[in-house]
Regions:
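SAM cofactor-binding core of SAM-dependent methyltransferases
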Residues: 60-149
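Short, well-ordered secondary-structure micro-motifs
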Residues: 22, 97, 126-129, 152-155, ...
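Short alpha-helical
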Residues: 42, 46, 93, 121-122, ...
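Active-site segment flanking the S-adenosylmethionine/decSAM binding pocket
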Residues: 2-11, 89, 140-202
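C-terminal substrate-binding/active-site "lid" region of AdoMet-derived donor-dependent transferases
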Residues: 174-251
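N-terminal auxiliary segments of SAM/dcSAM-dependent transferases
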Residues: 1-47, 58
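Alpha-helix termini
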Residues: 101-111, 155-160, 184-191, 213-220
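S-adenosyl-L-methionine
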Residues: 41-64, 70
Length: 251
């Protein structure tokens, strides 16, 4: 009982989300935008901190949070992608994180692009405003629609010819299906990195089995789990980090 009280004190918004069974798409997203505008952050890192503060003190958000943000930032700094696509943009937290890290990794913003694919029109609209507040709207383009149809259209329109970094953070049951859609478009070249969030919580066992399977190994994919924390709450989770180190897919 003492532990429960301590947990509730440390993570009040998470406790409310658990008790209600609702963690998104109930108006809290619009409340975040109002909170953001009232705090008026002027730097990408301030934007991320403001979202984290809202999630901790006002209402729980399903953003990646500060612990995983550090892991993803390090990956961007190491891999230095120029074209990044995320499936499941939500409110733009990860897009702002990625864009800021990409600018730092390259020492400028020339030739950098992020396509953030988001199904929900309200979340997409808020994400666009948050990208604008962060000063990164020239890099981040939020595309509304299903992940599969959106990336297919972007490739058909020649807006995407290759993807350096693919972030899967939408519906875990769609990770494998939508990875295969991207793979079939022949935009994952040697050196491409694919990161899947929440492979432990709530879990993506089918995707993990698929990406670590013999077929993907034969195609040149290497994959590993990287421990991270779901925040608020500090629940243990993992990011599945995969890289195409050998043969190019479908070439």
């Amino acid at each position: 009982m003492e532990k429960d009280a301590e947990f509730a004190k440390d993570w009040p918004t998470l406790v409310r989300a658990i008790e209600s069974g609702i963690e998104s798409h109930d108006g809290r997203e619009a409340q975040l935008l109002a909170y953001m505008l009232s705090h008026n952050p002027t730097h990408p890192l301030d934007v991320l901190s403001t979202i984290d503060e809202f999630s901790l003190r006002e209402d729980f958000l399903i953003s990646v949070g500060p612990n995983k943000a550090d892991i993803l930032r390090d990956l961007i700094m190491r891999e230095k992608p120029r074209m990044l696509v995320e499936l499941g943009g939500y409110l733009g937290y990860s897009a702002v994180l990625f864009a800021d890290a990409m600018v730092k990794a390259h020492g400028g913003d020339e030739g950098l692009k992020i396509y953030s694919l988001e199904l929900d029109p309200i979340c997409a609209a808020i994400a666009r405003q948050i990208a604008q507040i962060a000063g990164l709207a020239h890099i981040i383009e939020v595309v509304e629609g299903t992940a599969a149809s959106s990336i297919t259209n972007l490739v058909k329109e020649n807006k995407i010819t290759s993807v350096d970094f693919l972030f899967l953070d939408h519906v875990e049951d769609l990770y494998e299906q939508d990875f295969k859609v991207v793979e079939a478009l022949s935009v994952l070249k040697k050196g491409a990195v694919v990161v899947a969030d929440n492979v432990i919580r709530p879990g993506a066992p089918e995707y993990r089995e698929f990406i670590r399977g013999d077929m993907k190994k034969e195609q040149g994919w290497e994959s590993r789990g990287v421990k991270g924390l779901i925040w608020p709450g500090n629940f243990e989770d993992e990011l599945e980090v995969s890289k195409l180190v050998g043969l190019e897919v479908n070439n």
